[in-house]
Amino acid sequence: SMAASVVYAGVFSAVLASLPAVSTKMVVFDTAVVDLSEKLADPVEVLFGTQLGGGTDINLALSYCQTLIRQPQETILVLISDLFEGGNAEEMLKRMARIASAGVQVITLLALSDDGAPGFDHHHAAAFAALDISSFACTPDLFPDLMAAAIQRQNISQWASTQGLTSERARKA
């Protein structure tokens, strides 16, 4: 279940949205996409306004996120997903490749919780790794440091490794 990840993502998104130096968007998805960006000033609204059902269409969510990207070189996209794609997996991988090649810094969190890495789609994580996109589980206490590293354009795979977070990319390297 992604429930803990949704809660932490809502809290961290609200905190990031309160920082004047960054522009924060929050998009949640199952088989539909909901943009909660306008609600980020009220974390309670975000948390209780998030009703996700079953199913996952990552490709649809990425398609929507592409419409939000104005400055790819200054964009960090954090995808929180187990990478099990219920939509068009081939198109999802192509879309992610286009997003990354445009200069967007993409980070895939398999979970944002204290529970460690859940079951996840290893094939998609490996495909992301081939695009230099790390996939790993991150604990809430390390998330602020992760975002600091991303903002500073540090190598996220190396950062994850130094934190003891095993990334799919680190395993392949």
Walk through the language-model features, giving the residues of each:
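Structural beta-sheet core signal
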Residues: M26-V28, L77-L79, T108-L110
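Von Willebrand factor
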Residues: V34, D42-V78, E85-E90, A117-F120
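Short glycine-enriched loops at secondary-structure junctions
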Residues: F29-V34, S113-D115
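Amphipathic alpha-helical interface segments within eukaryotic helical scaffold
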Residues: L19-K25, T31
